[in-house]
Amino acid sequence: RLREIQDASKHPLRFRVSMEHFDEDKNDTIRGKGAYRKAIAGITCLAEVGFSPILTVTRTWKEECDSEMESQFVEVLRKSGVKQPQIKILPGFLLGQLAENERNYSQDEYVTEKCFEDFDITQLQCATSRMATGEGVYVCPILVDNPAARMGNSLGDTLRPFPLSHSACYTCRVTGMTCKSIP
């Protein structure tokens, strides 16, 4: 069915699958038991119908190891049948398990208007995209567990600006990170 939808659309259909590690045990320590196998099954299913999902991972290693880690993740995608492996490495957002393992955001880690004075706001995914889930449509994939980031039930409900008030917005700004899949 996904292939039919893609073939009928003038816009590309892209999928991103989130994992934390190429090792099953290390991934499941963060994502929960069985998460690795579910992700691999989803990646394999998408590859079988001709899609090349983008693998999104959160950096839990030193930045200088990015190249080595990316190679390992590319190998996981290739073994799953993905013809054009793409990896998106995100900085650590102090949310969920990472906040439990390390720390929460401090009172000083938030965005202000000054943060965006000489910054192209369209570089942030929230300026041009939304995250649709079974629970509604959210401003950002990082904030799908935050009820305040839920914008409505349909894409039509989200055709409006959203205040950049969450500390995760701070991480995007100070790291120069963008969730966009295409450079």
Locate the predicted segments by residue.
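Short secondary-structure transition/capping segments
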Residues: 1-3, 66-69
